[in-house]
Amino acid sequence: PGPRVRRKANDFLHRGEYSVCDSEEHWVGNLTQATDLRGNEVTVLPHVRINNVVKKQMFYETTCRVSKPIGAPKPGQGVSGVKAGTSSCRGIDNEHWNSYCTNVHTFVRALTSYKNQIAWRFIRINAACVCVLSRNSWRH
């Protein structure tokens, strides 16, 4: 027999395992407005100074992947994909269940400004994409 090939950690799709909702991760470096723990709309400052070094504020977000409709428009014609909250979850029995994928949030610290006061506050960012279920009919 030949040498064994080591399987990658992300090769799980070959085992028949799929995510119920597709998500994507990305760094956000241009966040200007956010909601804090108290529900206030605060301004996120673009840079922070730590030990006399200026750093750009970056946030790592996970969001529901926007699926493109079949027969997507050609380049230059615009794309109106399905927004999070409108696509049903994978593997759900649509005859008995309503389902949709939606973003859930977490709070992270950020340097912000609110009512002319600059402070570190917890702001809400997208943390994951989850499936929401409800019964299609209450009859069994």
Swiss-Prot record:
One of its GO terms (biological process) is modulation of chemical synaptic transmission. Disulfide bonds join 21-101, 64-129, 89-131. SUPFAM superfamilies: Cystine-knot cytokines (SSF57501). GO terms for cellular component: axon; dendrite; extracellular space; synaptic vesicle. It is found in: Secreted. Residues 1-7 form a propeptide. SMART domains: NGF. Pfam families: NGF. It comes from the Eukaryota. InterPro entries: Cystine-knot_cytokine, Nerve_growth_factor-like, Nerve_growth_factor-rel, Nerve_growth_factor_CS. Coiled coil: none annotated. The keyword Disulfide bond applies. Keywords: Cleavage on pair of basic residues, Disulfide bond, Growth factor, Secreted. One of its GO terms (molecular function) is growth factor activity. Belongs to the NGF-beta family. This is Neurotrophin-7. It comes from Cyprinus carpio.
